[in-house]
Curated annotation (Swiss-Prot):
InterPro entries: Alba-like_dom_sf (IPR036882), DNA/RNA-bd_Alba (IPR013795), DNA/RNA-bd_Alba-like (IPR002775). Its main location: cytoplasm. Keywords: Chromosome, Cytoplasm, DNA condensation, DNA-binding. GO terms for biological process: chromosome condensation. Signal peptide: none annotated. This is DNA/RNA-binding protein Alba 1. It comes from Methanopyrus kandleri (strain AV19 / DSM 6324 / JCM 9639 / NBRC 100938). It comes from the Archaea. It is found in: Cytoplasm; Chromosome.
Amino acid sequence: MAEEENVVYVGSKPVMNYVLACITQFNEGANEVRIKARGRAISRAVDVAEIVRNRFMPEVEVKDIKIGTEELETEEGDTVNVSTIEIVLEKPV
């Protein structure tokens, strides 16, 4: 799987780890950073986007938000629906 550029995958680590990752991407010259999460990490992804915008980089705007559902297969062979979110933050040039 090719690694996407300027994407921060939110999981179970502390929120500030992901905030720092976003700020680092912007400081390295990225005009756009995508924050992706699924399941219980969705609320943490929203927190990351809001902290970046409100506390650290007020010039950054939310460009797009995409929500969806992924079907995952369990070890027993059942399928489970998992919600996903992608938040695109943009730094005006």
